[in-house]
């Protein structure tokens, strides 16, 4: 399992390649990603965050072992080789337990790391940047690094115990955007300074030395930084290479290190490619994939309304709206404004808080009903042209079967294709 180390080596040798990380637990998104990687014969990096998946189940109800089992079962069913599958853990640290005293939060973080590593996750993002209940705000680089080193030691010991070798690849760094997109309207974003990036690296190197972990430094493959990309509900801050030049050049001084960029969702294909060229060679994508899923489902729901009598329709959109209103905890603190603004945000926001609701049984039943209604007879081509024009072109050329499921998968794969092209290298 050296796909990432090899990618970094090639990038450092001038290939300007990279890898994208699929950050989603939705079965259709994962199927789209696995099938796309299979067709293009590339490894696939799938990541779970500490919010989604933890030793207690996270918000998905899955432990790391459950998540691995779920992904591997899907990969097997699609004949995707498990040795081409890389599993990553994102923001692993005390993130979920910031309301607890630091000692308790870090004890939970130790167990979190053990559970991810024991389950076979090989890319580990150590993130101890968040202040706990009795911590100063913000934490110093030294405290953050000491906590990360403590977790790295736990990870190494767990890996040796379970697999007989220490082959983990680490990502460190703390200057990340708000996970899942910013809450507020944005206009401009500060790029991580080279000095801040160097300070993070040096603090971590020193802390790792104190833990006797010098030998793992070459396996610290990436530093999370902010290259100046972000999105809010209706806007995207596009990558501006000139603002990140000094940061980009800094990466060239490190033999085995590249940068990891979070919240790259909705960047243009040109910006994604330039990010990789500028050494932001691990691109995280999540909400953009579930946004594409939601687009396809809304389009199919509109087609259904044209074809099926109202009383027999799935009512997917209304079911979704009702469930989101009944259980507002995933969007209420994110979406602001009057009733209409919040209604639009629930359905269409780039931050895609609707992704938290797809597992709901009522919504899942409505989804299954929608697919059944549209699978009974062929969808008329003019309606595919009206509501899914990019897929229509592929249907007409014979590349794509016009079934509901294939239309959804292909629409998600249009986003994956942008990331694949950005990461291909020379």
Swiss-Prot record:
Biological process (GO), any one: phosphoenolpyruvate-dependent sugar phosphotransferase system
One protein family per Pfam: GatZ_KbaZ-like
GO terms for cellular component: plasma membrane
Transmembrane segments: none
Pathway(s): Carbohydrate metabolism; D-tagatose 6-phosphate degradation; D-glyceraldehyde 3-phosphate and glycerone phosphate from D-tagatose 6-phosphate: step 2/2
Top-rank taxon: Bacteria
Assembly and binders: Forms a complex with KbaY.
HAMAP family on file: Tagatose_aldol_KbaZ
Family in the record: Belongs to the GatZ/KbaZ family. KbaZ subfamily.
Function field: Component of the tagatose-1,6-bisphosphate aldolase KbaYZ that is required for full activity and stability of the Y subunit. Could have a chaperone-like function for the proper and stable folding of KbaY. When expressed alone, KbaZ does not show any aldolase activity.
Name of the protein described by the UniProt record: D-tagatose-1,6-bisphosphate aldolase subunit KbaZ
Organism of provenance: Escherichia coli O6:H1 (strain CFT073 / ATCC 700928 / UPEC)
């Amino acid at each position: 399992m050296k796909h990432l180390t090899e990618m970094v080596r090639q990038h450092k040798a001038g290939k300007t390649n990279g890898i994208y990380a699929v950050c989603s637990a939705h079965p259709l998104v994962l199927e789209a990603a696995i099938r796309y990687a299979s067709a293009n014969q590339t490894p696939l990096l799938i990541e779970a965050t500490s919010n989604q998946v933890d030793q207690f189940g996270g918000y998905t109800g899955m432990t790391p072992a459950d998540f691995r089992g779920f992904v591997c079962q899907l990969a097997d069913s699609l004949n995707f080789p498990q040795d081409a599958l890389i599993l990553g853990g994102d923001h692993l640290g005390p993130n979920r337990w910031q309301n607890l005293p630091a000692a308790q939060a870090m004890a939970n973080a130790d167990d979190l790391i053990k559970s991810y590593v024991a389950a076979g996750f090989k890319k580990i993002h150590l993130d101890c940047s968040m202040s706990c209940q009795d911590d100063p705000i913000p934490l110093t680089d030294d405290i953050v690094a000491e906590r990360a080193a403590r977790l790295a030691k736990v990870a190494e010991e767990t890996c040796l115990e379970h697999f007989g070798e220490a082959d983990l690849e680490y990502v460190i760094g703390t200057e990340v955007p708000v996970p899942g997109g910013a809450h507020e309207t944005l206009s401009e974003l500060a790029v991580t300074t080279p000095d801040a990036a160097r300070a993070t690296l040096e603090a971590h190197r020193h802390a790792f030395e104190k833990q006797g972990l010098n030998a793992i430094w070459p396996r610290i493959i990436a530093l999370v930084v902010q290259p100046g990309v972000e999105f809010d509900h209706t806007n995207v801050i596009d990558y501006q290479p000139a603002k990140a030049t000094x940061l980009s050049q800094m990466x060239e001084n490190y033999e085995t290190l590249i940068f990891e960029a979070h919240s790259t969702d909705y960047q243009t294909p040109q910006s994604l490619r330039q990010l990789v060229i500028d050494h932001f060679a691990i691109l995280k994508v999540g909400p953009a994939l579930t946004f594409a899923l939601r687009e396809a489902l809304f389009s199919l729901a509109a087609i259904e309304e044209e074809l099926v009598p109202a009383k027999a329709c799935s009512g997917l959109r209304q079911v979704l709206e009702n469930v989101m209103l009944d259980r507002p905890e995933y969007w209420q603190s994110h979406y602001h404004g009057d009733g209409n603004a919040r209604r639009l945000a629930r359905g269409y926001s780039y931050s895609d808080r609707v992704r938290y609701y797809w597992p709901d049984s009522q919504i899942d039943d409505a989804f299954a009903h929608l697919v059944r209604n549209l699978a009974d007879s062929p969808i008329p081509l003019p309606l595919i042209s009206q509501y899914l024009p990019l897929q229509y072109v592929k249907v007409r050329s014979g590349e794509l079967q016009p079934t509901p499921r294939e239309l959804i998968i292909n629409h998600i794969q249009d986003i994956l294709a942008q990331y694949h092209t950005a990461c291909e290298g020379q």
